[in-house]
Amino acid sequence: MLPDKGWLVEARRVPSPHYDCRPDDEKPSLLVVHNISLPPGEFGGPWIDALFTGTIDPDAHPFFAEIAHLRVSAHCLIRRDGEIVQYVPFDKRAWHAGVSNYQGRERCNDFSIGIELEGTDTLAYTDAQYQQLAAVTRTLIASYPAIADNMTGHCNITPDRKTDPGPAFDWPRFRALVALSSHKEMT
């Protein structure tokens, strides 16, 4: 799963136009976990790809009319079945965090990687999603070691606006999978 010029080899690539360059000499040092479902609470359709590529049809669902104007992206999406979709290379700045602050640092998009989990705040995430998120995180830590100590939810960097990944996300389970996997690789 090693990155190929910022792309995961095993991910399905759906390049987004919604990204730009990070500030000079800025390497990713933060992982931000998000959730998304389009329409809200529905899974498996083409709508997340459409949102992140700027091609969502505002007439396809009433909710889409509210979001069709957005220019947003994440680096990756992990679907319910564990499929990884990548929209933006990791060395580029995806537009996932918005107005944000992490430990006193503003503009989290400048120094973070955003990974979306297909889901909602209150529905349990799947085992496949945890396994893939841990695998991607290990890969990221190998290239960007500071991420090991800086993993958070969207809700923690934008607490007045966002709630994801929500109470359904099992942080201890995720951190244990990352640690267990990292330990296996060292032995």
Swiss-Prot record:
UniProt xrefs under Gene3D superfamilies: Peptidoglycan recognition protein-like
GO cellular component: cytoplasm
Site (described: Transition state stabilizer): 162
Enzyme class: hydrolase
Cofactor: Zn(2+)
GO molecular function: metal ion binding; N-acetylmuramoyl-L-alanine amidase activity
SMART domains: Ami_2
BP GO terms, sorted: cell wall organization; peptidoglycan catabolic process; peptidoglycan turnover
Keyword Zinc: yes
Predominant subcellular localization, coarse grouping: cytoplasm
Domain N-acetylmuramoyl-L-alanine amidase: 29-167
Membrane-spanning ranges: none
Location of the protein in the cell: Cytoplasm
Keyword vocabulary terms for this entry: Cell wall biogenesis/degradation, Cytoplasm, Hydrolase, Metal-binding, Zinc
Signal peptide annotation: none
Positions of the catalytic residues: 116
Enzyme Commission identifier(s): 3.5.1.28
Keyword Nucleotidyltransferase applies: no
Family: Belongs to the N-acetylmuramoyl-L-alanine amidase 2 family.
Job description of the protein: Involved in cell wall peptidoglycan recycling. Specifically cleaves the amide bond between the lactyl group of N-acetylmuramic acid and the alpha-amino group of the L-alanine in degradation products containing an anhydro N-acetylmuramyl moiety.
Protein name per Swiss-Prot or TrEMBL: 1,6-anhydro-N-acetylmuramyl-L-alanine amidase AmpD
Organism of origin: Salmonella typhimurium (strain LT2 / SGSC1412 / ATCC 700720)
The encoding gene: ampD
